[in-house]
Regions:
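N-terminal loops that bind phosphate or other acidic moieties
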Residues: 2-217
Length: 217
């Protein structure tokens, strides 16, 4: 899988790998027919039915089965925290990571109850944790730069981060992942990315963030 656009004359642009569409009307109809043939009222499984149809299309099978799902949590710190966008310091990111790895966090408890493997990926926190079971090191820096003052990442850092993600997922044992992220101040860069990708004003895409009400208090 190439991380570069071969049609581009410049290799400085980071390109997201192409993901082909998974919609297959014939397969979706076949899966739905299989569900409707069960001895129960049609539609009685609610959201589970549409989810089964969706997963079947993704896995390209009329009898989808999730195998060894992994919870993949990617952690990183954001330079925009210097602008006071969060009520907490960046050091809390590392504390959250340790809580998950020690099995004390909510996601850890839920994963344990359902027999799911949990991996915490250090993509670039300021205060890295020592090596330990469940921790994957794929750092592209000690946090990003302050996006208000300069680009948060270089093109090469972006390419490396995308490549790291592809490699991490490709190396997982199963056929399903549950994605999560953590990092103090993450609402701000997420809003910047969405505004840029969707071509929307920043005011329309930014939210109050963790611990704040709709008014941002």
């Amino acid at each position: 899988m190439s991380l570069h656009d071969p049609s581009s004359s410049s290799q400085s642009e980071a390109v997201v790998p192409f993901i082909p569409p998974v919609l297959d009307a014939d397969r979706a109809a076949a899966i739905q027919a299989r569900l409707d043939a069960q001895a129960r009222p049609p539609g009685s499984l609610g959201r589970l039915e549409s989810l089964a149809v969706q997963i079947g299309q993704i896995l390209r099978t009329e009898a989808p089965r999730l195998q060894e799902p992994t919870v993949l949590l990617c952690a990183g710190d954001h330079g925009l925290v210097a602008q006071g966008v969060s009520a907490w310091p960046s050091s809390v990111t590392t504390l959250m990571m340790q809580g998950i790895l020690s099995g004390e966090a909510t996601v850890s408890v839920l994963a344990r109850q359902h027999g799911l493997n949990v991996q915490v990926v250090d993509c670039g926190v300021i205060d890295p944790l020592p090596e330990q079971p469940g921790l994957v090191l794929r750092r592209v820096g000690a946090g990003t730069a302050d996006a208000l003052l300069q680009p948060a990442m270089t093109p090469e850092q972006c390419r490396t981060a995308i490549r790291n993600g592809c490699e991490q997922v490709a190396g997982l044992p199963g056929n399903a992942i549950l994605l999560g992220e953590m990092g103090i101040g993450n609402t701000s860069p997420a809003s910047l990315l969405l505004a840029r990708l969707a071509g929307l004003p920043i005011e329309q895409v930014v939210g109050p963030g963790a611990g704040l009400d709709a008014a941002g208090r």
